[in-house]
């Protein structure tokens, strides 16, 4: 995509797939990386007893409900201590080591925070494509599978779902616009 002209990317949101994060750093070095909050929660839950998942879920959500990055960092440190006290050391280690990857969104306008913490919109599209391809079962070749996926994407683009404005990008460029106006 970079070779075809992709530029100006400021944020990449994904799970912690090593190949993806390394490629992003190599090809889009100016972009920040945001670990999907939902994927992070699932990773933490895999190290928590089933009876404690709900409690830990509330703890993790409290981190991301903070008003600033500093407050979120303080809350995360407190939660790491709480997890260690509750003898969930592996989960505590994971939170301590990786929670900062989920807090990148604090560097962007606060009206965007809710929408850039996860990659759920993309996950929703992928789930829809997967649902359609499972109905078919076996494809005669890769091209027919690609055709079905492309048809589904064309359908999504043509519906009201794709015409809704997901995020107002103006606040993201507002400081740049003000600087440009000051120079002029």
Show where each model-derived region lies:
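Acidic/histidine-rich catalytic cores and adjacent linkers
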Residues: 66-184
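Generic alpha-helical structural context detector
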Residues: 42, 46, 61, 127, ...
């Amino acid at each position: 995509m970079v070779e075809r002209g992709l530029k100006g990317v400021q944020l990449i949101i994904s799970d912690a797939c090593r190949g993806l994060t390394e490629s992003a750093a190599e090809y889009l070095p100016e972009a920040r990386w945001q670990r999907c909050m939902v994927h992070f929660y699932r990773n933490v839950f895999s190290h928590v007893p089933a009876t404690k998942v709900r409690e830990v879920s509330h703890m993790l959500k409290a981190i991301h409900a903070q008003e600033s990055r500093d407050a979120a960092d303080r809350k995360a440190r407190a939660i790491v201590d709480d997890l260690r006290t509750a003898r969930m050391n592996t989960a505590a280690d994971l939170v301590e080591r990786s929670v900062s990857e989920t807090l990148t969104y604090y560097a962007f306008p606060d009206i965007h925070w809710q929408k850039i913490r996860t990659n759920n919109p993309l996950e929703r599209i992928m789930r829809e494509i997967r649902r359609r391809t499972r109905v078919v079962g076996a494809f005669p070749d890769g091209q027919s599978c690609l055709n079905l996926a492309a048809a589904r994407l064309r359908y999504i683009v043509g519906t009201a779902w794709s015409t809704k404005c997901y995020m107002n990008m103006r606040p993201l460029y507002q400081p740049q616009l003000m600087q440009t106006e000051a120079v002029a």
